[in-house]
């Protein structure tokens, strides 16, 4: 509806509201000035969002909150966010796993899935523990004993999925670990290890690199972006997707460690 009000028999059209309405209406709001991102956590994507926010200044709003994969998809299905980051197991199985996961949520027929990058997922530990694993004085599965304190992620996070699958291979469950509690982001998890509150947690290699911690790789995973089709061509969404192929951004990813950008920006699935 056109933004207007009627005063003493005359229609008034506030310019600011009218301009905003025109932008929203034109090409599905291609110049819309808001991009809200939820879902899985990633240090490099945080850098991209921070850089975009700094360049955009007060002209647009871009925000990224790490809710975990499943909560992010729930928020997207209700229209609360414009993009959701997901990772749900091994990269070689992502072509089947990710669409199957999306199809559990209402609205998925209006979604498109874009490959951001592959990254290494594993155990984040202190450098001392990593050195012990590297020289084979400790086997990774020994970290399952009750003496080691685990930092967890919230239920529905992709990291918890990866951890559960690794534990299953060793006839273990999450409930059998000595847990210090759930962390709401990979950064919070890594921070608890860096401060000595926990000994180990499951997160990406880049998160370990950001905090100068040790890393024990478990698998390669596909980190992908879910975007509603009707907002896919908006300016902010396209800026973020183009940033994934930027040489400077990829250089930062190489410094953090564990990234593979060979398929960045490719569409891998579209709802029907």
Regions found by a protein language model. Give the residues of each.
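Short coil/turn segments
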Residues: 37-43, 89, 121, 125-133, ...
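Flexible hinge/capping segments at coil-to-helix
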Residues: 116, 125-150
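Short beta-strand-to-loop elements that line the ligand-binding cleft
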Residues: 60-68, 174-186
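Periplasmic-binding protein-like
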Residues: 107-122, 209, 213-242, 263
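N-terminal segment of the mature folded domain
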Residues: 30-31, 45-130
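Short helix-start
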Residues: 3-25
């Amino acid at each position: 509806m056109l933004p207007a009000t009627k005063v003493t028999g005359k229609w008034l059209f506030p310019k600011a509201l009218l301009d905003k309405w025109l932008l929203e209406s034109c090409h599905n709001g291609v110049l819309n000035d808001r991009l809200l991102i939820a879902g899985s956590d990633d240090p490099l994507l945080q850098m991209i969002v921070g850089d975009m926010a700094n360049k955009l200044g007060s002209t647009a709003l871009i925000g990224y909150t790490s809710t975990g994969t499943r909560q992010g998809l729930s928020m997207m299905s209700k229209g609360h966010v414009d993009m959701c980051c997901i990772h749900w197991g091994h990269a070689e199985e992502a072509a089947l796993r990710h669409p199957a996961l999306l199809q559990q949520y209402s609205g998925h027929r209006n979604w498109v899935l874009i490959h951001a990058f592959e990254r290494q997922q594993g155990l984040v530990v202190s450098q001392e523990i990593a050195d012990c694993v590297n020289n084979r004085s400790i086997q990774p599965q020994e970290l399952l004993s009750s003496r080691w304190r685990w930092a967890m992620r919230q239920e529905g996070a992709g990291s918890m999925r990866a951890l559960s699958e690794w534990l299953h291979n060793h006839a273990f469950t999450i409930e059998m670990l000595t847990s210090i509690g759930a962390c709401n982001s990979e950064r919070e998890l890594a921070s608890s290890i860096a401060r000595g509150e926990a000994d180990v947690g499951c997160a990406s290699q880049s998160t370990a690199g950001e905090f100068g911690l040790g890393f024990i790789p478990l698998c390669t995973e596909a980190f992908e972006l879910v975007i509603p089709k009707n907002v896919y061509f908006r300016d902010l969404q396209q800026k973020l997707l183009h940033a994934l192929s930027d040489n400077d951004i990829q250089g930062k990813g190489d410094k953090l460690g564990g990234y593979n950008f060979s398929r960045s920006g490719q569409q891998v699935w579209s709802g029907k």
